[in-house]
Regions:
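Short, contiguous pre-domain boundary segments
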Residues: 1-4
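A translation/RNA-centric and nucleic-acid-associated enzymatic feature enriched
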Residues: 17, 33-63, 67-75, 84-111, ...
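Aromatic- and glycine-enriched glycan-recognition loops and surfaces
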Residues: 10-14
Length: 233
């Protein structure tokens, strides 16, 4: 078997097994538009703008979706129940040895699930895909305590700028969430590269995005595989 054929079959099996996992839990597969009239509102992600024949629409300016989140949440609001989607997404300024302007994304929603139930769901998905590596779960704050001895949630803007400077890092930032993320990349991510699968949960409220805020933290998490962030919820 050629190397290309093997890769294609592996990809086919991966997608099929993901679908089987969600089908077995009565999660409905959906397809939503990838061509939208507005760009993403996420300040850290850039949409790709495209133009179409004006005869097809009132506007000639559209944007390729950076994720199916918005359209899927509209389905949820209409009472769809549990849903998932596997699709291509597009982001500008993402090309590199890790990121790409186009990639495949899995997006899913489980109605009534809290953050830790979603983590358990993903762990079950990984097991169904053949993963038997140990899994670590740790809060954002605890990770900073354990790996950098920093009280990240109770440190103010100036305090975190001083920490950046003490590590020889650029401190020219206007928002505390930017400093938090830079510190995470430089001080925490290198430490979790040795962990096969790591869930970081309870991010600072400044990084809530669309997540619910509970005190100083947002009820969201990310999953890292050997230091590479692959899941954001």
């Amino acid at each position: 078997m050629s190397n290309l054929k093997e890769k294609l079959l592996n990809h086919q099996n991966l997608i099929r097994n993901i679908r089987s996992f969600f089908y077995s839990r009565n999660v409905v597969e959906v397809v939503t538009p990838s061509l939208l009239t507005t760009p993403t509102t996420d300040v850290y992600i850039d949409s790709i703008e495209v133009s179409v024949n004006q005869a097809l629409s009132k506007s000639s300016k559209f944007y390729l979706h950076t994720s199916p989140e918005l359209e899927m949440k509209r389905l949820l609001a209409k009472g769809s129940g549990d849903i998932f989607q596997i699709c291509q997404v597009f982001r500008d300024n993402e090309h590199g040895h890790i990121n790409s302007n186009e990639f495949t994304m899995l997006e899913f929603y489980r109605v009534g699930f809290d953050m830790h139930q979603l983590i358990d769901d993903i762990k079950a998905l990984l097991i169904s895909l053949g993963n038997d590596d140990p899994v670590k779960e740790i809060s954002y704050a605890q990770a900073f305590y354990d790996y950098a001895e920093i009280d990240i949630l109770n440190s103010d803007f100036e305090g975190l700028k001083n920490i950046l400077e003490s590590h020889g890092l650029n401190s020219d930032y206007e928002w505390i969430e930017d400093i938090q993320m830079v510190l995470f990349v430089h001080l925490i991510e290198p430490k979790i590269k040795t962990i096969p699968v790591c869930f970081i949960y309870d991010f600072p409220k400044q990084q809530a995005a669309l997540a619910q805020i509970d005190g100083l933290v947002a009820n969201r998490f990310e999953m890292y595989i050997k230091g590479l962030s692959l899941i954001h919820i």
